[in-house]
Swiss-Prot record:
Tissue and organ distribution: Ubiquitously expressed.
GO MF annotation terms: oligosaccharyltransferase complex binding
Family matches, as InterPro entries: TMEM258/Ost5 (IPR007915)
Family from the record: Belongs to the OST5 family.
Source organism (scientific name): Homo sapiens (Human)
The name this protein goes by in its record: Dolichyl-diphosphooligosaccharide--protein glycosyltransferase subunit TMEM258
Entry-linked PANTHER family: TRANSMEMBRANE PROTEIN 258 (PTHR13636)
Amino acid sequence: MELEAMSRYTSPVNPAVFPHLTVVLLAIGMFFTAWFFVYEVTSTKYTRDIYKELLISLVASLFMGFGVLFLLLWVGIYV
């Protein structure tokens, strides 16, 4: 296959929105991280719910992970 015959790859996300996605995703992730921390500090061992802990931590890690991904893309580290 010739190089000229191949179509150029275009990103599904416009690079102009990388900064906005970074800030929004990291802010949401920090909110859920803070919520998880406050929940852990203020609850006793009798009032803790493992499913709530797992859900909050999963959501926080997903938002923080994608936020860091777009941060890396924003600064030019293409992963």
